[in-house]
């Protein structure tokens, strides 16, 4: 009996399923495991201060041998504990911001869901073309924030940033769920201009929102994508340590220094995305 032209042979189906199952299984040496943990420490720290830790951990996972999508998915999951650790480290600066969290968190969560789905169904080039432009705009907002604050001082600004910030956080959540590098730069730029608040308190709020973006996207990835659980574990260990270190260092930076760090990280993000 001949095979139906619309159905793959059983052995081809089995091979496809086996290949998909093994995508997340890569033989990792002890040295490579240490490198992944150290990358997690650095990423957890830089994510707490500003963001873009993915620019370190994603290439490391690729270098170890994980396929791009598996590396991206596992990276998102592995950095969740570090994001939560960093948010906890900044809990003092979160005091009095419960209203903002309640208003903006749904935007981040919805964006993360959309972004995670886009990662699975769309080619990378369809989304990444605009990413450098978004980061560049965010950097301009961060640098111009003091000047803009003076110009807007006489205008009434919404305590929670208004509709414009909600939409901006939603769009940043989409990007964060899809890839995530420099997500923090985008959120910091938006909140710094649309809210009249000290940059350290803005950073604390950013840590909460980006942590939930990673968490929601990560949970979805468990069900709709391949996950390399060893990589997740190694990154989680490192990122928790890095998150606490980042909180201690970040809150000691004066506003001008923190803006300088944001600009440097943002420029590196643009360069790496354009050249990869």
Model-predicted segments: where are they?
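Transmembrane helix exit motif
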Residues: 84-95, 133-158, 268-276
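Selective hydrophobic functional segments
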Residues: 73-127, 133, 214-257
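Cytoplasmic-side transmembrane-helix entry/capping segments in multi-pass membrane proteins
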Residues: 98-107, 131, 155-161, 203-209, ...
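Hydrophobic alpha-helical transmembrane segments in multi-pass integral membrane proteins
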Residues: 115, 171-179, 217-225, 232, ...
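N-terminal amphipathic/basic-hydrophobic helices that include classical n-h-c signal peptides
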Residues: 1-27
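Lipid-exposed faces of alpha-helical membrane segments in multi-pass integral membrane proteins
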Residues: 34, 38, 42, 81-84, ...
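Membrane-interface alpha-helices at helix entry/exit sites of multi-pass transporters
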Residues: 66-75, 98-103, 196-207
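Selected transmembrane alpha-helices and immediately adjacent juxtamembrane segments
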Residues: 24-67, 154-203, 233
């Amino acid at each position: 009996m001949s095979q139906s032209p619309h159905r793959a042979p059983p052995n081809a189906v089995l091979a496809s399923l086996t290949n998909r199952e093994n995508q997340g299984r890569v033989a990792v040496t002890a040295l490579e495991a240490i490198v992944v943990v150290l990358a997690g420490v650095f990423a957890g720290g830089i994510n707490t201060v500003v963001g873009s830790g993915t620019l370190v951990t994603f290439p490391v996972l690729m270098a170890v041998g994980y396929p791009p999508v598996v590396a991206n998915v596992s990276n998102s999951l592995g950095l969740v504990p570090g994001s939560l650790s960093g948010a906890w480290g900044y809990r003092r600066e979160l005091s009095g911001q419960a209203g903002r969290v309640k208003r903006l968190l749904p935007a981040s969560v919805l964006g993360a869901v959309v972004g995670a789905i886009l990662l699975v169904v769309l080619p990378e080039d369809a989304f990444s073309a605009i990413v450098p432009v978004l980061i560049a705009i965010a950097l301009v907002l961060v640098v111009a924030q003091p000047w803009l604050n003076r110009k807007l001082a006489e205008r009434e600004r919404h305590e929670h940033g208004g509709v414009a910030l909600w939409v901006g956080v939603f769009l940043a959540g989409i990007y964060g769920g899809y890839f995530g590098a420099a997500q923090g730069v985008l959120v910091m730029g938006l909140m710094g201009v649309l809210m009249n608040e000290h940059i350290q308190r803005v950073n604390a709020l950013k840590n909460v929102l980006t942590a939930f973006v990673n968490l929601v996207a990560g949970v979805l990835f468990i069900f709709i994508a391949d996950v390399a659980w060893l990589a997740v574990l190694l990154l989680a260990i490192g990122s928790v340590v890095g998150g606490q270190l980042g909180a201690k260092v970040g809150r000691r930076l004066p506003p001008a220094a923190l803006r300088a760090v944001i600009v440097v990280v943002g420029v590196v993000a643009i360069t790496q995305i354009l050249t990869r």
